[in-house]
Each structure stands twice: as structure tokens, then as C-alpha cells.
Amino acid sequence: MDCKVVSLNEKDQFIPKIKSSDPVITGLFQYDAAQQTSFEKRMSKENNGREAALANVIREYMSDLKLSKLSSEQELNIQHLANGSKVVIGGQQAGLFGGPLYTFHKIFSIITLSKELTDTHKQQVVPVFWIAGEDHDFDEVNHTFVYNENHGSLHKVKYHTMEMPETTVSRYYPDKAELKQTLKTMFIHMKETVHTQGLLEICDRIIDQYDSWTDMFKALLHETFKAYGVLFIDAQFEPLRKMEAPMFKKILKKHQLLDDAFRATQQRTQNQGLNAMIQTDTNVHLFLHDENMRQLVSYDGKHFKLNKTDKTYIKEEIINIAENQPELFSNNVVTRPLMEEWLFNTVAFVGGPSEIKYWAELKDVFELFDVEMPIVMPRLRITYLNDRIEKLLSKYNIPLEKVLVDGVEGERSKFIREQASHQFIEKVEGMIEQQRRLNKDLLDEVAGNQNNINLVNKNNEIHIQQYDYLLKRYLLNIERENDISMKQFREIQETLHPMGGLQERIWNPLQILNDFGTDVFKPSTYPPLSYTFDHIIIKP
């Protein structure tokens, strides 16, 4: 597999500014992610004392992996964690069949950075992936997309439920027959390869052997990344929640100070010209599981109130729940990073472009709880380029970097005009210009008479519309005459810039596994990566 790094002319300059140590951006974080001294400081930080307990919890969480047991690399990393090794951590929602490709790329980011830190500092750093099983927005994880090569188009594949679950994703148990039907739909759209049957069997076995939504997600990730020694933990895992009880109590006691700190930091980021990323009305920033629903907690000055059942608690009652039933609580976007860092001895947190902006709004929250914000690193961004698409780019002389940023619409329109009669286009455009000049002359003739002005303008509008229609229909006919080329432009678009964004935000990992083999992401096949803020192109 070939691998190269390209620099894109990105519209969003947040990550390029992190790369260049822009003082406005670095001031939003505790550490400058582009400076080696930041890593030296984090590597030398004193541990919090929770590492042995965490190692036991992670071992328990991963003990139910049935398809294949823990790898020797994972066993070793659990031991390293118990002995005080620091971690590189990142997380993601449990998306259908692994979710978007960037989930895998986030894990590769964690693997790559932890290995580089281990090699540089001669201290073992453990890669940890945090499954956001506490989320309840099922609409965000119940679908994915598949590319149909025959049609040259993307198709949405969705797991359907009679009712949308309101509990956390970790507490959701999908209907296995319906999930297998969804999987079948996915594979119908994918081309048949020598890898298809084996991949389908792996997915079927995962559905057969696991029951909860997040356990199926965990099993797929484990099968893919076990050889790298990645450790997995679900935020909603009950033994982990019991460890979090002291922090839940602190959050409840300091909820107003926490909310004030968050709002103040968010306002500062807006004062620096950034858009507010975290949108929340709560002033407690926790959820409570009640009546099989994940419910947002707010405080009205006297009581803590749940948003779906209107149940209320006095302070002592809700703190008692945190003490004795912490598994009923879950964090929101503000408190999850805080809890994560309170638990782990983290060198760096790896996040997506939006995630790292969330963290920029939390600096004062960390300081309030005397928890230091780790280095916040943008994850690796990766695109897969197959031989066919590379040949099509060459055929139409389209720069890869341009497609990744802008898509192919500009190049497609240019191609259509090149196939058309230049004289025809020039004459129509000339008639449009002539009509505009004529309209100006007519308006001069009727100046001062509003009725006639309206008449002339309406007449001009009709003529311009007719000329526009003529030109558009002519170009549409040219487009239809070049239907093979149009399909090829669509192929490029759906592969490299699907739905107006990067491939990794839309494509599913099963597509890559089906095209290039079930070992494509394994250490024996996948190219060794170096951490970069630029874009990585991989040719399988």
C-alpha cells in the first residue's frame, strides 16, 4: 500500500492554525499541540492513582469478547496501564457497522501517536478508545452509506425500528433479524469480491454472538485493531460508572460554578471570532436514566428536574443517587471530557475537527475541578484512492487536492462546455447581453412612467429567462450525449467528495474491507503512519 501526505487549501483554518501555533487558538487550550515541549511536560506529569482500578475495569469490559480473545498486545497494554503507563485517548459514537470511516481513522490516530510517544520518550504509552455508549441520539448511529459501483452513486442504509429508543445506546438491544436484513442490504450494493463472503460471515457472527448495540460495535473494532494493542471501554459500563461516583457528586455540588465557567469560556471563544460549538440549555450538564429514558437534568433554584418526566429531586436526594447508583448518571458534551481526564492519565486527547472546537470551550471547566486539560490533537484525516479513480483523475486532468476540497462540479461544468459549440454559447450569451442593453435603452425612453417601467422590466425578465433556458437545455443535451463521462465524474465525486465532504465522513469501513480484504487494516498490510496535521492519501 502506498501512502503520501498532501497539504490542502482548507476552508476551515482551525487545524492549520493549530499546526502553526497561532496564539489566538493555542490560548484556548492548556497546551500547544504543535510543540514537542508540551508532550515532554505531559509525559512527566504525576499520575492520579486510578490506573490500576481502570485496568481492572477495562479487562472486565473486554472479557466478553467471544469471536476472538484479547491479543497478547492488548494483554500487555492492560498490564502497562495497571503499572502506571499514560494513555492517548479518543472516542466515538457506536455507528452502524463501524460508522463512518473516520472512526477507524481516529483509532489509527491514537495508535500512531501512542507509538511515536513510546518510541520518543522510552515510556510505554497505551492507546485507549472510548465508546460513547452513553449517547441516546439513536438517529445519529442507526444508518450508514454504501457506494454502489454499478450505479456510480451512494445509498443510505438504515436500521429501522418501530419506535426510536430514548435510552442510552449501550442499553439498546437491536432486533437481530432486522439488523441482518440491514447488513444484507449493505452487501447487495457492494460489488462482489473474493473478500465478500468472508467479511459477511464475520459480521453475521458478531450479530449472532452479541446482544447490545455497543457490544457489536466493540466486537467489530476488536477484530480489526486487536493486533495493535488498542484497549476499549464503554462510557456506560457499570463498573466504570462506580469509579466515577465521586466526580458525579462534585459536579452536582458545583453545577452552577461549572455552568458559569463553561459559559464564560464559550463567550471568550466567540470574542476571538469563533462560532459557539456547544449548544445546551442545561445548567447541570448531566443526564439521569429514569423510566427507561435518558433524561437531561436541570436546576430551577430549588430542585433538580428531569426533562421528560418532570420528576424533581432535592440536592441531598440526587447526590444520594450519585453515591449509590452512579450507573444511572451519564455526562453531556461539557462534562464528558472532564470525566475522561479525571479517570485517565492522558498525554493527549485525539478528536475530530468539531470535537477539538468543543474542547476549546472548556478550559475554565477543567480549571474549576483542578483537572488539567491534556494536549488536544486533531485526528489524522485519510482518503483511500483506488486505481480506477486515479486513472479517471488523470483522464480528465483533475488535481486530487482540488477534488478533496471542492469536489468535481467546476471541472464537470468546464468539461461540458468544452464539448459544446463555442459559437453557439457565445451567440446566446451575446443575445443576453444585447437584451440587457436594449432593456436599458427602453427604460431611458419610459423614464418617469412607473407602469411602463414595470412593463419593460417584465418583458426583459421573460427574454432573459428564455435565453437562460435555451442555454441550459443546450448544455443538458451535451451532458446527455456524454453520459459515460458524466457517470465517471459522478464516480470521482462520490468516492472522493461524497455529499460535499471528505470520503471518511460518509463511507463505511466495510466498503474498504470488502474491496481490499479483511486484513487491509492489519499491521501486516496497512502502511505505517506518521502523525501529521495534513491530509493522508492511501492507495490500497
UniProtKB/Swiss-Prot annotation:
Role according to the record: Involved in bacillithiol (BSH) biosynthesis. May catalyze the last step of the pathway, the addition of cysteine to glucosamine malate (GlcN-Mal) to generate BSH.
Q: What is this protein called?
A: Putative cysteine ligase BshC
Please tell me which top-level EC class this enzyme sits in.
ligase
Pfam families on file: CC_BshC (PF24850), Rossmann-like_BshC (PF10079)
Q: Which InterPro entries match?
A: Bacillithiol_biosynth_BshC, CC_BshC, Rossmann-like_BshC
Gene name for this UniProt entry: bshC
Q: Which GO terms describe its molecular function?
A: ligase activity
**Coiled-coil regions listed:** 425-453
**Would the keyword Ligase be found if you checked this record's keyword annotation?**
yes
- Keywords from the named record: Coiled coil, Ligase
